């Protein structure tokens, strides 16, 4: 399980 929160795609 990977918890990745990208700051792009706003």
UniProtKB/Swiss-Prot annotation:
Function: Hypertrehalosaemic factors are neuropeptides that elevate the level of trehalose in the hemolymph (trehalose is the major carbohydrate in the hemolymph of insects).
Protein name as annotated: RO-1
Any one GO molecular function term: hormone activity
Keywords: Amidation, Flight, Hormone, Neuropeptide, Pyrrolidone carboxylic acid, Secreted
Localization of this protein: Secreted
Family: Belongs to the AKH/HRTH/RPCH family.
Keyword Secreted: yes
Modified residues (Pyrrolidone carboxylic acid): 1
GO biological process terms on file: flight behavior; neuropeptide signaling pathway
Superkingdom to which the source organism belongs: Eukaryota
Gene Ontology CC: one annotated term: extracellular region
């Amino acid at each position: 399980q990977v918890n990745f929160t990208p700051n792009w795609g706003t």
